[in-house]
Amino acid sequence: QSFRWKENADGSFDGIAFGKKVRVRLDGERLYIENSNKADFESIWKDYFDLELDYGKIREEISEIHPVLKEAAKYAPGIRILRQEPYEALCTFIISQNNNIKRIKGIVQRLCENFGEEISPGDFAFPTPQKMAELSADDLAPLRAGFRNRYLIDAAQKVYSGEVDLESCRTLDYEQARKELMKITGVGVKVADCTLLFGLHRIEAFPVDVWMKRA
């Protein structure tokens, strides 16, 4: 789940990740990545889209667990778990708390426009923890993110100082990795699990949304 992709009229998608903007389109079973090169494909996009993992095998395995999972696997066979930049995943899921997708995307866009590096005219990378650690919650007022501003600043300061070590969460015991992320003000179990799954590819993480609980 990423908030920096926009669908175009022709069905292609424009997105920014790891400081690069690309256009992605699907033609049959072929995936085309435009505005890129072979080096970036090998070092960024192959990993980002998790292209080397056999999702067909995973669908087969989960289909045997429960009929509901079998139907879910059939419903959206093309879904892949994106390997996003960990700090960006952390911040965007902090922003996602008690929020809707349209508003989340707007806040993330304003965050990048105000504090991210311009990588091409009108396009901005996600701001670094170093940049955000220099700011105050009041500096984030243009984002219109409300109470989340102080959570974002706390996250930036703790990541930049090393108090929270995102990279260590790749190899820590799952529960310990969760606890590491929950040192950040405003990060509970769900945001920690989303960060672990989408930012650190800890596939044992299973974020449970409020709508799943209500169902």
Model-derived segments and their meaning:
Residues 1-215:
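HhH-family (HhH-GPD) DNA N-glycosylase catalytic core used in base-excision repair
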